[in-house]
Amino acid sequence: MAAVWQQVLAVDARYNAYRTPTFPQFRTQYIRRRSQLLRENAKAGHPPALRRQYLRLRGQLLGQRYGPLSEPGSARAYSNSIVRSSRTTLDRMEDFEDDPRALGARGHRRSVSRGSYQLQAQMNRAVYEDRPPGSVVPTSVAEASRAMAGDTSLSENYAFAGMYHVFDQHVDEAVPRVRFANDDRHRLACCSLDGSISLCQLVPAPPTVLHVLRGHTRGVSDFAWSLSNDILVSTSLDATMRIWASEDGRCIREIPDPDGAELLCCTFQPVNNNLTVVGNAKHNVHVMNISTGKKVKGGSSKLTGRVLALSFDAPGRLLWAGDDRGSVFSFLFDMATGKLTKAKRLVVHEGSPVTSISARSWVSREARDPSLLINACLNKLLLYRVVDNEGALQLKRSFPIEQSSHPVRSIFCPLMSFRQGACVVTGSEDMCVHFFDVERAAKAAVNKLQGHSAPVLDVSFNCDESLLASSDASGMVIVWRREQK
């Protein structure tokens, strides 16, 4: 069963940064050999139930051995070899829909593990339950993350030395999305309502635009990097999604929206990058197989409005979708079939578009509950706690920003798990980039970057937080350099 061995490899890859932290070559050899063995064993035809049991036990054992994970972007930053060893090009992608064992699984309903979030919480608490409040993490697992995070306060850590570079190739058209490549310090991409996507390289100096991806006939609303960064998926107002090769910028495939509607957002399934979820203007969410260009059977659902934002949890079992009428829906994602099952609905505020959703399974040692960061045109940034394994949400706190009409986005900072406090970053219609400490009871504002001349729509950190990119409604992309302590 191809999907299961990919999930096992993904679990191993997430923990790989913790193996022999001072000898990265050993980690590279390990994950390559692991990939080879898993591929060979996948052909042996073991029963799917046995494979799933192995996956579950493997995850539990790794969790007990190495402790709770920080987010993939921070943990894997120490091991770029993981990316190379788990490349997912179209040539090597498994045909998800044609897998006979996956097809056979459709004959019965397969639910998500009911204890997945409880297990995560137990694993997280186990490391800390006997420690006094405020004590440092007492495990060797913390060394790498503490070294990357440093011993400075949040205010000191998020002091910026100024602008590193300004990209203006999309000037006069909004840039709704900017993203650094996964586990990469210097590769950046941004999409524009002029219908193109830019792939940029920040090092060696001077920063350059490597490729401009053209093909969409209307504005590009969103895009996403694959885990291995070799593929990008983009969605457009021209009612198509496109698959691009990042190495040379060529379009590999164009896939029309099943409803013929404007496509407004997209995200990769984090465990199986053969699947991408898209949201459209006809209120629908679709799971798409990018190898076949087809919609996955059972992988569609309808919301109450235009789908503007999507986000998976780290294991890929929960999906949240936000619409322009103020609702956030959670879905259970069946790993075997790609089927979506609608679970919960939260009305953030009736009539207020939900423009951004960012999920984080483990914010910091002071905030270990799975969390969701939401922008919703309320002049507030909202932080929710995920309270059960069906994605139900409970408001934890809010932060004041200016957002009443623009599609502003926000992110969790990637290296926050072992700091005192935890930081989030958001754009704003006041033309500034805002930093907030989610654990600080009063005066949560940590920093504010000024330099844009239009509402800031999106923000993105590179893997080690040395650079931050922000994009605005006038088409400007600013790369900020963090002050070195």
Swiss-Prot record:
WD repeat residues: 170-210, 215-254, 302-341, 406-446, 451-484
MF terms in GO: promoter-specific chromatin binding
Domain of life: Eukaryota
Modified sites of kind Omega-N-methylarginine: R114
Sites bearing Asymmetric dimethylarginine, chain numbering: R114
Subcellular location: Nucleus
Biological processes annotated in GO: negative regulation of type B pancreatic cell proliferation
InterPro entries registered for this protein in UniProt: WD40/YVTN_repeat-like_dom_sf, WD40_repeat_dom_sf, WD40_rpt, WD_repeat-ST_regulator
Gene Ontology annotations for the cellular component aspect, listed alphabetically: centriolar satellite; nucleoplasm; plasma membrane
Residues carrying Phosphoserine: S70, S74, S79
PANTHER family, sorted: WD REPEAT PROTEIN 26-RELATED, WD REPEAT-CONTAINING PROTEIN 13
Protein name: WD repeat-containing protein 13
Organism: Mus musculus
